[in-house]
């Protein structure tokens, strides 16, 4: 298996308050990238990512689901997370292993209570992210108010990368401020959008918000700032490079807009994911500690030549294959059927089979390399937060710590008639 260019990998998650349209965005991404040929619909219970019967029945995401797609010759590994406050742990475990995030906001309300929670969690793990203001076709949609709520409630430097053309039923598309081009959608089919010159009625707004964007980017880079104050024109490439650097440093959070339900704004969002969110080599190398002495720090680079290290971030039971252990591989190579060292339990385990997950479907692979997110079958003792590594080069990664529960209870199952009959039978001598 040829080694993958890690600069062309994106490990991202979609995070949001409930009903912001996060899963709908993910479904449109899968359709637009050609991973699915039929658009999943929450109301019809046909989504790819919400595959559990209870999720489809209630129309909400309960568990995080992993998938992958390809865009502009880049591999995009995606985790779709729940928006409901009761499933916050699913968001936390996902953010722990992701390199970047897309925060989906609803165009009417902007930042909502759970938006604040997931934003704090992303801050905790220093996850670079961008913002997608969804449902621009909804009654009461207000892009600029949504951006303002990010400033007011999150204290984040949110800067529009696009501005919408219209809102509510008159939402036609969006304008790319850096490129100075408009995307107009004339039908419900996302493929049918067209790039045009900026309509006259938006030219003044474009120059206003473009200048604000340029100034924000220049503030984060001394070389760009010098050119800006010398009244030298900054090229689009210079601005994109500066914006990417600012996003990676958590200095700017670019804002895009669209309507996922009507397929509008998906392809510019994907382009922005590739252009501005980090690859595994753009984020700091993972650091752990010596298994015997926690005061000794060990670093692993995202390279296949480094010793193997991975973190377990989720364990589920599949009705067809049994126990599935989800891993983020930080360094080295994991081969199917190989033995690994669980440094959390000080024991050896065997990764029998490796799977690349697409929601509830699986694609068996022979090996997985640094930067990938996969599932393993055969790991019997590994649980969430455990470190798997090369036994000859062990280390212990920081575990995943969940908030303490506010409620505890015991569940008792009703005994079956067979159990009752057994309890009444006299015991043998």
Residue ranges and their predicted role:
Residues 1-414, 418:
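Structural and coupling elements of P-loop NTPases
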Residues 416-419, 423-429:
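Positively charged, low-complexity/disordered segments
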